[in-house]
Swiss-Prot record:
Positions of ATP binding: 102-105, 152
GO molecular function terms listed in the Swiss-Prot or TrEMBL record: ATP binding; protein kinase activity; protein serine kinase activity; protein serine/threonine kinase activity
Family label: Belongs to the protein kinase superfamily. Ser/Thr protein kinase family. WNK subfamily.
Gene3D superfamilies, per the entry: Phosphatidylinositol 3-kinase Catalytic Subunit, Chain A, domain 1, Phosphorylase Kinase, domain 1, Transferase(Phosphotransferase) domain 1
A family per Pfam: OSR1_C
Protein name: Probable serine/threonine-protein kinase WNK3
Biased composition range(s): Polar residues: 442-451
Coiled-coil boundaries: 457-490
SMART domains hit by this protein: S_TKc
Residue intervals of the Protein kinase domain: 22-280
Length: 516
């Protein structure tokens, strides 16, 4: 709290009738019909949003106000991960306002968030779309169905840290619906389906509005921005003329999906049908997950051994942010029989790179196609961006010290040789045991730990072996130093992309560290 407990009540400029919620002066957002303030739930100790809507003379009688209150208060029963939590509401008869307490999203609405983060991949937009549609399926499945009627990017809110998207302003939509007179329509013309103007509509008006939301997210253009007033928008909408922004959608799949959303009501798909559309279906959560974790690697149990050329496209990566630096990613592979297998693994944005993780995954899962590495790496980059738009992937090529450090640690290399054919680069993984060279000295060897007297012949052999092994180590170290110098100089002569491709084909572990 910004002041001591004795003065805490002075921070609030208004308190709800129960004394539980206190409103601050800070305004989080403003709309045509409401203002949203920062508020505090004293019982739970959490910040909330205090939505205050000014009522007009359409609610002149107490019966009208009570009817409105009952309709809005029913929203408290709505509980879904894609719907903003609605805590309580009440009517202030003295000031003619209705107040709604909801959860607060400090990242703002989706329109503000999209303007702030220009570089959002299509995959992130698909994830947001799925969440919105899942919320609409929930609303539309009620009996009678709950229709939002004023869905737009301004009424969809996002938690930037988690990538959560939730539909909001349902209470305001209900108020506006109740406020309609016989011959007037209150809403946002750019997002209103043609049938809304005729006041003969169903849940599909929300699908139309969702399509316009997606159009705005893709193009950064408000629908029908070519029009100068609401009358022009009305004429275009009722005449079936699509917004000019649709022409700026260059991806044919995206455009086709948006057109399905804003089609004539007789041809428009429901939210449930859209979730099954091929455009979004590949991102649907699989209920038969086969997952495992390894502290220092990735377990391939349950994963297909190899992807054919036709199956590369049936590979996806999904993620969920767990803390400030860690995102748990899920690699999903579909085999030739159509069976889906998943593997979950942590990705630390501070220490991991998509390229090194992709290389290790391909090796662990025995995926031999070089294309799989770049495909997985790009998917990981895209997924991380969907959770952290400001994240910058680590790129290749750096100072000589990093190269020297990596080359001087042969344990990081997977192959037994470099292109030169020298096999001394090969080094066993930790715990490899008997995979080591039979001539390498071992700390637990009988040679070094044998007890008791030793005969003269054995002693001579031991002495000569120690001398030979010492000389061998010195020669190997000298060759390593020569190779370090040769490889370092060699890599300097080529662009980063060429070096990266070469390291991919060599299947070198930690290749990002080699070059960054």
């Amino acid at each position: 709290m910004r002041q001591d407990e004795n003065n805490s009540e002075e921070e609030f400029v208004e308190i709800d009738p129960t004394g539980r919620y206190g409103r601050y002066k800070e305004v989080l957002g403003k709309g045509a019909f409401k203002e949203v303030y920062r508020a505090f739930d004293q019982l739970e100790g959490i910040e909330v949003a205090w939505n205050q809507v000014k009522l007009d003379d359409k609610f002149c009688s107490s019966e009208d106000l009570d009817r409105l209150y009952s309709e809005v208060h029913l929203l408290k029963t709505l509980k879904h991960k894609s719907i903003i939590k609605f805590y309580t509401s009440w009517i202030d008869h003295q000031h003619m306002t209705i107040n709604l307490i909801t959860e607060v999203f400090t990242s703002g609405n989706l329109r503000q968030y999209r303007k702030k983060h220009k570089c959002v991949d299509l995959r992130a937009l698909k994830k947001w779309s799925r969440q919105i549609l899942e919320g609409l399926v929930y609303l539309h499945s009620h009996d009678p169905p709950v229709i939002h009627r004023d869905l737009k990017c301004d009424n969809i809110f996002i938690n930037g840290n988690q990538g959560e998207v939730k539909i909001g302003d349902l209470g305001l939509a209900a108020i506006l619906h109740r406020a309609r007179s016989a011959h007037s329509v209150i809403g946002t013309p750019e997002f209103m389906a043609p049938e809304l103007y005729e006041e003969d509509y169903n849940v599909l008006v929300d699908i139309y509005a969702f399509g316009m939301c997606l159009l705005e997210l893709v193009t950064f253009e408000y629908p029908y921005s070519e029009c100068t007033n609401a009358a022009q928008i009305y004429r275009k909408v009722t005449s079936g003329i699509k917004p000019a922004a649709l022409l700026n959608v260059t991806d044919p799949q995206v455009r086709a999906f948006i057109e399905k959303c804003i089609a004539k009501v007789s041809q428009r798909l429901s939210a449930k049908e859209l979730l099954d559309d091929p455009f979004l279906k590949c991102y649907k959560e699989n209920t038969e997950n086969v997952s495992s974790h390894k502290e220092n690697g990735y377990n391939g149990n349950g994963i297909v051994d190899k992807l054919s050329d036709s199956e590369v496209g049936l590979l996806t990566v999904e993620g969920q942010r767990k803390d400030l630096n860690t995102i748990f990613l899920k690699l999903r592979i579909t085999d030739s029989k159509g069976q889906i297998r998943n593997i979950h693994f942590p990705f630390n944005i501070e220490t991991d790179t998509s390229f090194s993780v992709a290389i290790e995954m391909v090796e662990e899962l025995d995926l031999t196609d070089d294309q799989d590495i770049s495909t997985i790496a790009k998917m990981i980059d895209t997924e991380i961006h969907s959770h952290i738009p400001d994240w910058t992937p680590s790129r290749l090529i750096g100072d000589d010290s990093a190269v020297q450090k990596c080359l001087s640690s042969p344990e990081t290399l997977h192959l037994d040789r470099f292109p030169s054919g020298r096999k001394f680069w090969s080094s066993p993984k930790a715990g490899a045991g008997d995979s080591r060279s039979p001539f390498a000295p071992r700390s637990n060897s009988k040679l070094s730990s044998a007890q008791g007297p030793i005969n003269q012949e054995v002693g001579v052999i031991v002495e000569k072996l120690e001398s030979l092994l010492r000389k061998q180590r010195e020669e190997i170290e000298e060759m390593q130093r020569d190779q370090e110098r040769i490889v370092t100089e060699f890599l300097k002569e080529f662009p980063p992309e060429i070096c990266e491709e070469a390291l991919v084909r060599l299947q070198v572990k930690d290749s990002d560290n080699l070059l960054c």
